[in-house]
Every structure is written in structure tokens, then in C-alpha cells.
Amino acid sequence: MPKKFGRIHLVVMDSVGIGAAPDADKFFNHDVETHEAINDVKSDTIGHISEIRGLDVPNLQKLGWGNIPRESPLKTIPAAQKPAAYVTKLEEISKGKDTMTGHWEIMGLNIQTPFPTYPEGYPEDLLEKIEEFSGRKIIREANKPYSGTAVIEDFGPRQLETGELIIYTSADPVLQIAAHEDVISREELYKICEYVRSITLEGSGIMIGRIIARPYVGEAGNFERTDGRRDYALSPFAETVLEKLYKAGIDTYSVGKISDIFNTVGVKYDMGHNHNDMDGVDRLLKAMTKTEFTEGFSFTNLVDFDAKYGHRRDVEGYGKAIEDFDGRLPEIIDAMNEDDLLMITADHGNDPSYVGTDHTREYIPLVIFSKSFKEPKVLPVGHFADISATIAENFSVKKAQTGESFLDALV
């Protein structure tokens, strides 16, 4: 079967969810002050930002963001009379609301055993191994679920004095190491993270989904995390559609932390880590305009929505970031060929107006655009992996574990 689309570009607006998922009652955030567990039933990332701050997103509105099925319409994003794109929302079937789970399911995997989390912090024997390898002590008081900005506010001054490591976790399956660049160089931090990754793989006794390097700079009271973040993930436990494309000889481009999330498996050309989301758009455009990129798949993650604004519960910053991305959409569309397909989605929610500091269990929006479309419409609500099943069918490779293609619906 001939390809319907020569190139497919998938852009993940990290954490930009569109309302509580049907199973949101099984997922929780914890009140920062009372530590009370509150389920995610009332979470609604786009909806609450639209309601509280307002969103001026003319390009996403024309594509049909306001047409996505919801119990109540978005306050400041009206439905388009004739949307320029197919739109819908997708439900997650995997047992997790973290980055790896979301991206892996989008690429066709069904994660029914959630990655282990460490709400009480990491065990002493692991910390001792890290101390022995690094030659640095670890601040034990930080070894618990912590906001990334709060942990450096609380322990950054001490690290500047002592050179101790700040190791912390969250409600997600991650071990994060924060290091002030004046005390611990990026190179040293990355070596420590690589070591931790090597001793926390499956079968090692303690498995961790991702090890994250978190360098920062500044002075007490004015610390700022830098763009030197690195994620050290596990390899997917089964073949994803990304890997199937690669093995079939189809060009695959990654932008941002996609290569980290999949541990490079299935990535042929890595466009590098983003300094920020606008730099990520620049990198995507650079990939799209490469003369040799005539057919294939690009996969982009824009993480600032999540890392800079969602976890920090910054409604204003989050809204501004969405508007900034909206302002770049015409450039992305201009760079598309007539037979290109653009899909814009998310990987989970992170409602900046919600209790706690962690992700929220939500539907994700899906916008599907091509210059060749005649009369786009609203598609039935589907599942995350429908994206990869559609990509797989287009490029004549087998889908992964789950997902139903909607390729035939795109006319």
C-alpha cells in the first residue's frame, strides 16, 4: 500500500492535558502543606488555564482545539466553525502518569506494571554505593519526594558549602540529582548519573525508571536550573513503533528529550536537547527543512510546559508558554510539504492550578493537520497508542502491542 503521507511530525506538548481521565480517581496528588492525598478527578490542565488566566491561541483555535469533546467548552478557546484539522482526545490505558509511560504508550506499548516509586526515599545501601563511587556525601534530608525548585532552595546553600549531593525523588519513578555548577561540573554530574543508571536496571534489586541530572546556578534565594538536564532512561521492554520504523530503514528524527526517553532505541538522527521550548521549535524546523529529510518521522518533546510551569504550579507562565508555542505554529505549517502530516498532542496532564506538584491523570488532546485535508472533523475519542498505530500503517510496518489506526479516516 502506498504511503498516504511522506513525512509525519509528532509534537508532544509535555503535560498539556485536557481534562480528567475516567480512572483519575485512582491517581493522586499530595497537598504540600497537609500531605493529604487528593485524587486527580477535578484536574483539567488546558481547561483551568483557559478559565483562570485565559488563552489567546488563534492558531490552535483555527485547528480545532476548542472543538475537542469536553463536558464543558473551553472558556477562552471557542470552537472553530470549520476546523482546519482533525481533533479528538485520547485516553491512557497504562498504569502510570509519568513521562516514560506516556511516551512509550504513544509509541504502542501497554505498561500494566507501573514503574516502582519511592515515596519514602531511596534505600540506604543505594545511597552508600553512590557516595563510594562519587567520593561525595549525600544530604539525607533531601532524600524524599520533593519539588525540584524547592529542594535547591532548601539545600542549595548547604551544597555550596559542603559539596554534598542533593538526591531526591517525586511521585514519578525518577531519581534526580541536583548539582550547582560552581561546585559539581556537568561532566562530573553526568558521570554520577551514568553510574546510578548502571546499578538500577531491571534485575538489579532496585529498578528506577529514569535517572535525571539537574544542574543549576545562582546564589541562595536566586537559584535557577539550567538547560543541562539529562535523562537516563531504561530501554523499552518491547519494540515500539519508533524502533520498528528504524529497523525498516525509515528515517527517524528526535528533538528534545525523546532520545533520552527511549534510551536512543529507534532514533536515527538526534537533533539534540532543547535549551527551551522555542529552541525546540527551532530544532524541529531545522529537521523539517533538511534537504535529505524527504520521507520519514520526526518526534519532538517540548518539556517546559511541564518542567518550568506545571510542577511549579505557575498558571501564568504555563499559559504564556502555550501562547508562545501557538505563535510558532505558522512556521511549522509553512515548513510542511503537501503530503506531510502534523500531529500535536501531550503525554499526561500537569494542571498548574491543582493541589500538589505532580502530574495529573488526564486525557490528552490530539490535533491532526495536513495541507491536503479537504474537510477535517472531530474524530471519536481513542487511546494514546492510536497515534503510533496510524504512523505504523502509513509506513507499512506492524503496530506495537496496542493501538488502532485512524489513517483511513484522514481524507
Swiss-Prot record:
Its cofactor is Mn(2+). Mn(2+) 2 binds at D306, H311, H359. Binds 2 manganese ions. Its EC number is 5.4.2.7. It is found in: Cytoplasm. It holds the Pfam family Metalloenzyme. InterPro entries: Alkaline_phosphatase_core_sf, DeoB, Metalloenzyme, Phosphopentomutase_DeoB_cap_sf. SUPFAM superfamilies: Alkaline phosphatase-like, DeoB insert domain-like. Pathway: Carbohydrate degradation; 2-deoxy-D-ribose 1-phosphate degradation; D-glyceraldehyde 3-phosphate and acetaldehyde from 2-deoxy-alpha-D-ribose 1-phosphate: step 1/2. It comes from the Bacteria. GO terms for biological process: 2-deoxyribose 1-phosphate catabolic process; 5-phosphoribose 1-diphosphate biosynthetic process; metabolic compound salvage; nucleotide metabolic process. It catalyses: 2-deoxy-alpha-D-ribose 1-phosphate = 2-deoxy-D-ribose 5-phosphate; alpha-D-ribose 1-phosphate = D-ribose 5-phosphate. PANTHER family: PHOSPHOPENTOMUTASE. Isomerase that catalyzes the conversion of deoxy-ribose 1-phosphate (dRib-1-P) and ribose 1-phosphate (Rib-1-P) to deoxy-ribose 5-phosphate (dRib-5-P) and ribose 5-phosphate (Rib-5-P), respectively. This is Phosphopentomutase. The gene is deoB.
